[in-house]
Each structure stands twice: as C-alpha cells, then as structure tokens.
A protein has these predicted regions:
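Alpha-helix capping/helix-boundary segments
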Residues: 11, 45, 76, 102-103, ...
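Short acidic-hydrophobic, aromatic-tinged amphipathic segments that line or gate anion-handling sites
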Residues: 70-73, 131-135
Length: 138
C-alpha cells in the first residue's frame, strides 16, 4: 500500500539549506518516505520556503524530489481555524492562524502522514495525525 507524506518546511530546509545537525536524518527519512509513496508539498510550505531561494531554484528542488504539489483543501482551512482557536484559548499569543495549523490540517484532511521536526505542536492540535519525526523515527 502506498502512503503519501506531506513534508514540513523545516525538513526541506534541512536538505536544501546549509548542512546542519538534522540534515542527515531529514535526507534519509525523505528517501524512506519516497519509497513508501508520494511526497507532498503544499502552498503553505512553498510560501515559507520562498524567502530562501529563487522560484526557479525551488521548482527545480521540488522536481528533483518528485514532489506532488497540492493546494490547501477548504476543509483543512476550517480545521486550521479550529486548531488556532484552541491554541488561543490555551494562552497562545499569535492572533493570526499559524502556518503549522494549515500544514497539519491539510495532512489530516487529505490523509497524508506528516514529516516534521516539530512534532509537539502538531500532536497537541492534531492527535490523530500520523507524524514522522526524530522522536518517532530516530
């Protein structure tokens, strides 16, 4: 069975940016997820990557990984708003919906796993989301 994986911004920065302590982990897990099925990038992740490279360079990097591009589903936008509301009630200070809420909600609604290094917030607001992180896949 093929499994699709939405890749979070921080993991892509690990492999496309300067080498750091998470680069090796991120590269190996991206490869493993690619063997399992489709790698997904959405418009939110794309926008977070925009300041880091030219659009042409980002397109080439996405093509190199053979990533599928997806728009944010309407249902995910609603779910992100609900998650943000919970965040605010719990004392969160950001007034505008955080990108992580859109990314997590997209993964939930579309049935994707999420590959991220920031699992804590996603687990808090999307408890049923299948998360791949350094804690779950060392």
């Amino acid at each position: 069975m093929k499994i699709s994986t939405l890749v979070d911004t921080n993991v892509l920065i690990d492999v496309w940016g300067p080498a750091g302590r998470q680069t090796k982990w991120s590269a190996s897990v991206i490869a493993a997820c690619r063997r399992d099925g489709a790698l997904i990038i959405n418009t939110i992740v794309w926008s977070e990557l925009a300041p880091l490279a030219t659009e042409a360079a980002l397109r080439k990097a996405v093509e190199t990984l053979k990533m599928d591009r997806e728009l944010l589903p309407w249902e995910a936008a609603f779910l992100a708003g609900i998650a943000h509301s919970q965040y605010r009630r719990a004392g969160g200070l950001r007034e505008r919906t955080l990108p992580d809420f859109f990314i997590g909600a997209h993964a939930v609604v579309a049935g994707h796993r999420l590959l991220t290094r920031d699992a804590v917030r996603y687990r808090s607001y999307f408890p049923d989301l299948d998360i791949i992180s350094p804690e779950t896949h060392p």
